[in-house]
Amino acid sequence: MIASGGIADHSDIKQVIASGAIAAQIGTLFLSCDESGIAPCYKNALIQAKHDSTVLTRAFSGKLARGISNSFIKQLKQLEELKNIQPLPYPVQNALTQPLRKLAGSQNNTDYLSLWAGQSVHHCHKTSVSALLNRLTQPT
């Protein structure tokens, strides 16, 4: 078993290995690294995120996924609650929001960009992959 989700530091890795996992998979923390190719505004959103910044949403893709809450997610949630308008299923919703996401990315507009992030997003820092790997592999 490979453990994933919520892993942010060396102690988390030790804990999942002690629980029987053979490895730990980490995603979100690498997005904020200098070497990541995501939009600068996305990196900044990750670095500024708090522990309660993420929500589960179907707004951008039609599939349930966790991301940093923004204006688009909030507006779609209002439509769901007030008018019972649901996002379309994947891949239709994903295709429909693609031009919006592309434009938002080109304008560094995080209000209409999908900002996928896990529950450990509040542990994101401006760092290099090398420094992150050192932090993950060395006890504090």
PLM segments and residue spans:
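Conserved active-site-proximal phosphate/metal-binding subdomains
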Residues: I2, A8-T140
